[in-house]
Design a protein with these regions (language model features):
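Bacterial N-terminal signal peptides that target proteins for export
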Residues: 1-7
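N-terminal signal peptide c-region/cleavage motif recognized by signal peptidases
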Residues: 16-18
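Terminal, regulation- and interaction-focused segments at domain boundaries
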Residues: 21-50, 55-60, 161, 165-170
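Compact, glycine-rich, soluble single-domain proteins
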Residues: 55-107
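Hydrophobic/aromatic beta-strand elements that line small-molecule binding cavities or substrate pockets
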Residues: 110-114
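A short, structured loop/turn motif at beta-sheet edges
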Residues: 115-121
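C-terminal partner/receptor-binding element of secreted or periplasmic proteins
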Residues: 125-170
Length: 170
């Protein structure tokens, strides 16, 4: 796999998250664990909730490895120790979306990102319901968001964050 293809894959995973962060609210769960433990717990609750993990990317590592070439100004100013993306899907929800309004199925597989700094991690999931094109697909997308949130609330040592946490640039 070439560096360009790795960066393209990383960008494709991040782009949906960025669109949701700007256009829609995001759901944030704070976990009192470092990345390795937090990622393991997130993957476990997703699996137990009926989701299939399609792809896992260490975004910070992939882009950081290209920093000398890319020369991104102010890269990782908040000094996250790790940022990972998880692409996942519930096959049954995917089938419902295809059958109700097939273009909306582009929102599934779903993505979430885990941001870690020291012993604390944050799971960020962009809500999908506002992107539904029909009342039927909106109902399915709302149920999907509710299901994902319920699953994420099962992460041990976690709690819902109200608003966006102030992660200092220290």
């Amino acid at each position: 796999m070439t560096a360009k293809s790795v960066l393209l894959a990383a960008g494709m995973c991040l782009m949906p998250g960025l669109a949701f962060a700007q256009a829609n609210p995001v759901y944030i769960e704070k976990i009192d664990m470092p990345m390795a433990a937090a990622a393991h717990e997130v993957e476990s609750v997703l699996h137990d909730g009926g989701y299939k993990i399609v792809l896992k990317l260490n975004i910070l590592k992939l882009i950081g490895a290209q920093q000398k070439t890319l020369k991104i100004p102010h890269f990782n100013e908040r000094h996250f120790s790790d940022i990972r993306a998880i692409v996942f899907c519930n096959p049954f929800d995917f089938s419902k979306l295809i059958n109700s309004s097939w273009p909306v199925a582009a929102g599934c597989p779903l993505t979430l990102d885990i941001f870690s700094k020291g012993q604390t991690s944050y799971v960020v999931y962009g809500l999908r319901a506002d992107y539904a094109l029909t009342p039927q697909s909106r109902k399915i997308a709302e149920a999907l968001d509710t299901s994902v949130i319920k699953v994420l609330q099962g992460i041990p040592m976690s709690r819902v964050e109200k608003g966006i946490p102030d992660i200092g640039k220290k």
